[in-house]
């Protein structure tokens, strides 16, 4: 059990993903918010798959899991309903709105492609994800990230449906999605960074603007109507920028994270100076704003586990970000983390606590594929912004990259299950920035290949749905 003045964190379930897990995403679409997807990445070394001539490249294996959450199954709330083997999954996102009546999941994979899968509802409330379209961006690189332009869950009628993606060559790719057929069309590709472009993300309030972060330590903004020159370049992070998310609740608010072990909060109208800077003692691979509480930010901090951050005073009063909850997982790297869109009314049940000094997670007996690590090469580039101080610990940049980059360990070496009924309250249309008693979240970790389901219990009784008239006294709907 991990606790803080803000509440208690309990682990409800641990699932062995067999391959190393790096991405986890709760479905945001109303009616399907009990579904959870998890993506994995595993490098198969030549000794595991020998080539006759010794020249066959190493294989990046992947698997996509689909789970259904049920509060009634207290022993195992997550039920696996599908698994699909594929190329390694490096990022994935659900589209926040149905497309032609269907729920879509987008994947960025190790074959350099973006793929779309359609959620199919079968008999007995069963679900499967079926491929519907794919677009190869570059066969000689990895697709490292992707984002939908629908992050606010609402959009202006004239706005097209778009995807932005980044790759291991430092390029960005803008794609258009045909809303009738779900076919993908490449609109533009352009060089954005000197080395790996770890992350690309939309400004959800003005989707012509996108942001990117790279292994060259740069955070950049782009206007997709006038490509060629970035709108801004910031080097406030002193190591590779690997996570970015625009706030879906407050215009102009942007969160970024880096291998420098800092989370920065920005007002995009003044990109020279961040609103706040909080050290998190781990490289920040993912950042996720809470779907309801405007000020809560979830950070996957690699070798330092994950943290829940309160950004309210930083945004409203230009004060520091507060770390509400921190959970370390010393035997692995946390790459994936996401908030559930469900408010759930689980009654107190016997749950086992997560001891930070003893992992205590007994997974099924599966052999673990080993990966080796090699730090990428880096460079410096002058920009308009001053450089910030380095991380508080004594690690050099090369040491950190060697320890934090299993996803790219080989980059420089090679040229029908039914879902249970769910008793939940849909909060996707609620507003207000106050805490509520229970939140569900999921994380996935790399070396121990485990997906964790957590319940964060806060001790504060505050108004959740200000002015919406929703009644949280009952969870039935």
UniProtKB/Swiss-Prot annotation:
PROSITE patterns attached to this UniProt entry: WD_REPEATS_1 (PS00678), WD_REPEATS_2 (PS50082), WD_REPEATS_REGION (PS50294)
- In residue terms, where are the WD repeats? 194-232, 236-276, 422-464
User: Which GO BP terms, alphabetically?
Assistant: protein histidyl modification to diphthamide
What domain of life does the native source organism fall in? Eukaryota
- What pathway is it annotated to? Protein modification; peptidyl-diphthamide biosynthesis
Q: Which family does it belong to?
A: Belongs to the DPH7 family.
Q: How does it assemble?
A: Interacts with INCA1.
Name of the protein this chain belongs to:
Diphthine methyltransferase
């Amino acid at each position: 059990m991990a606790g803080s003045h803000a509440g208690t964190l309990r682990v409800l379930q641990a699932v062995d993903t067999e391959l190393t897990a790096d991405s986890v995403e709760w479905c945001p679409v109303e009616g399907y918010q009990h579904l959870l997807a998890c993506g994995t990445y595993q490098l198969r070394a030549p000794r595991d798959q020998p080539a006759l001539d010794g020249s066959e490249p190493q294989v990046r294996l992947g698997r996509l899991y689909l789970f259904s959450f049920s509060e009634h199954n207290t022993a195992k709330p997550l039920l696996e309903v599908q698994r699909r083997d594929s190329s390694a999954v490096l990022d994935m996102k659900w589209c926040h709105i149905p497309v032609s009546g269907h729920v879509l999941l987008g994947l960025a994979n190790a074959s350099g492609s973006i793929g779309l899968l359609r959620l199919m509802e079968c008999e007995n409330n069963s679900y499967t994800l079926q491929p519907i379209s794919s677009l190869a961006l570059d066969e000689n690189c990895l697709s490292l990230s992707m984002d939908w332009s629908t992050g606010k869950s609402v959009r202006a009628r004239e706005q097209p449906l778009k995807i932005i993606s980044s790759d291991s060559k430092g390029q960005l790719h803008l794609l258009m999605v045909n809303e009738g057929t779900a076919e993908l069309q490449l609109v533009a590709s352009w060089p954005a960074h000197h080395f790996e472009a770890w992350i690309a993300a939309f400004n959800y309030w003005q989707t012509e603007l996108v942001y990117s972060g790279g292994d060259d330590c740069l955070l950049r903004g782009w206007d997709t109507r006038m490509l060629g020159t970035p709108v801004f370049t910031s080097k406030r992070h002193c190591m590779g920028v690997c996570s970015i998310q625009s706030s879906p609740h407050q215009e102009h608010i942007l969160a970024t994270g880096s291998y420098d072990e800092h989370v920065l909060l920005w007002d995009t109208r003044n990109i020279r100076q961040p609103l706040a800077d909080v050290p998190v003692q781990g490289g920040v691979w993912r950042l996720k704003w809470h779907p309801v509480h405007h000020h809560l930010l979830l950070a996957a901090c690699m070798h330092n586990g994950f943290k829940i951050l309160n950004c309210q005073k930083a945004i409203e009063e230009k004060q520091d970000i507060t770390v509400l909850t921190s959970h370390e997982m010393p035997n692995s790297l946390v790459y994936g983390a996401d908030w559930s869109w469900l408010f759930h009314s689980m009654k107190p049940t016997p749950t086992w606590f997560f001891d930070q000094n003893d992992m205590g997670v007994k997974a099924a007996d599966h052999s673990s594929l080993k990966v080796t690590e090699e730090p990428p090469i880096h460079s410096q580039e002058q920009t308009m912004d001053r450089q910030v101080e380095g991380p508080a610990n004594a690690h050099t940049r090369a040491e950190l990259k060697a320890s934090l980059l299993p996803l790219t360990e080989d980059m420089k070496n090679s040229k029908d299950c039914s879902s249970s009924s769910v008793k939940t309250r849909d909060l996707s249309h609620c507003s207000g920035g106050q805490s509520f008693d229970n939140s569900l979240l999921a994380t996935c970790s790399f070396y121990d290949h485990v997906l964790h389901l957590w319940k964060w219990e806060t001790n504060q009784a505050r108004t959740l749905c200000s002015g919406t008239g929703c009644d949280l006294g009952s969870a039935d709907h």
